[in-house]
A protein has these predicted regions:
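Short, surface-exposed, charged amphipathic helix/loop patches that serve as local interaction elements
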Residues: 12-103
């Protein structure tokens, strides 16, 4: 779960969600890393809601976030995928590795 602007959203990494994400990236070879992560956030949010109910994230929800909330969501997506894949990562954002929202 990640809290964005006071509302909690669940993220669930599944093989199905991963396949949908991979299909999206394969179909769009010019996709930016930022857009790919946003797409993954939307798919993971939908996968969570399919299992647990609730309202999934929408792209407008993400694009209207303040930078701090946006970075929190991106971090949650990466951490959830890594956790469910059994990978240990370091995800503390810094100025050096910050990602722009420009698509």
């Amino acid at each position: 779960m990640v809290e964005i602007n006071g509302k909690e959203y669940g993220l669930f990494y599944s093989v199905r969600a991963h396949c949908e994400y991979d299909d999206y990236v394969c179909e769009h070879p010019n996709v930016s890393v930022t857009r790919a992560i946003i797409q993954k956030a939307l798919i993971m949010s939908k996968a969570y809601c399919d299992i647990h109910g609730g309202t999934p994230l929408k792209s407008a929800d993400i694009m209207n976030l303040p930078n701090s909330e946006y970075m929190k969501l991106m971090k949650a997506v990466v951490e959830q995928e890594a956790k469910d894949s059994g990978i240990e990562i370091e995800t503390e954002p810094t100025e050096k590795n910050a990602v722009s929202r420009e698509l």
